[in-house]
Every structure is written in C-alpha cells, then in structure tokens.
Amino acid sequence: MTRSEFLKPLIGEPWAWQSRNCWDFACHVERELFGRELPRVAVPAELSKRWVLEAIDRHPERAAWRQVADGPGGLVTADDGALVLMAHLRFPAHIGVWLRSEARVIHCSEQHGVCCESVLALRQSGWKRLTFYDPL
C-alpha cells in the first residue's frame, strides 16, 4: 500500500473521545507509516480539557522525542513523522503528525475528525503555537 492509499481514506473519519482521539490517531499514523509503537493512554470516561493538558505535559513518552527548532522564517525543519504539539495559547492541548513530503499535519480533532492541514491553516484556525518533535 502506498502512503497516499493509506492516508486518503482516513480523511473525514470522525473523532471519538474513547477510541479515535488525537493521541490514538497519532499512534495509528506513527505505527502504520513509520513503524513506531507509541504507548496507549487510558482516557477518563468524560472528556476533560484539564486532563488533556496534564496528560500531554507530563507523559513520559515526551522524553523519547527531541524538540525541533524552527528554521529561518518559521520554516518547519522536522523530519517526516515528527509529532506536532498544538496550543491555542501557552499549553499544548492537541497532537498530530507532520507529513514532510505533503507539508501538512494530519490530526484528528473533535470539530472536524481526521484532517490534513498546512501549518498556515492550523494557525488560522487558532492553533497559534506549534511545536515539532523528532524521535530520539
């Protein structure tokens, strides 16, 4: 299966807190496209923004990834398959996967389900702070 054949049917899949949240989706993409197994995260029964913020901030998996500095003019220099933490203001509350050849971030949001967006589109939709992480 080609990369395009894998990605195309995912677009538009719905978000689901217990089974298809942003982390579960990032794990799926990392496993299928990049052969990386990321740990599963047990989520509480009820959606809690506070829980999301704390889980992203404190999860030990973050130690296995290196933050990538922005290139000149804010260009993305991260490797293909980098994790992308997204924040509206200061604290990350969402995660996606950088697809370098497509110059897009694929992610699964509560509002839109699975979508593949440019950095500019993400910033225009309110994700003002994007931080890229390459695996160690």
Predicted regions and their residues:
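Generic recognition of cysteine residues
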Residues: C22, C27, C108, C115-C116
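Active-site nucleophilic cysteine motif
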Residues: P14-F34
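Short acidic alpha-helical/loop segments enriched in Asp/Glu that coordinate divalent cations
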Residues: R36-E46
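A glycine-biased structural micro-motif
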Residues: F6-E13, G35
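Solvent-exposed, flexible loop/coil residues
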Residues: P14, S19, A42, P60, ...
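Glycine-rich, aromatic-bearing surface loops/beta-hairpins
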Residues: C115-L136
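...with weaker cross-activation on analogous glycine-rich loops/strands in unrelated enzymes
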Residues: P44-G113, L136
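Short, charged, amphipathic alpha-helices and their helix-cap/turn boundaries
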Residues: T2-R3
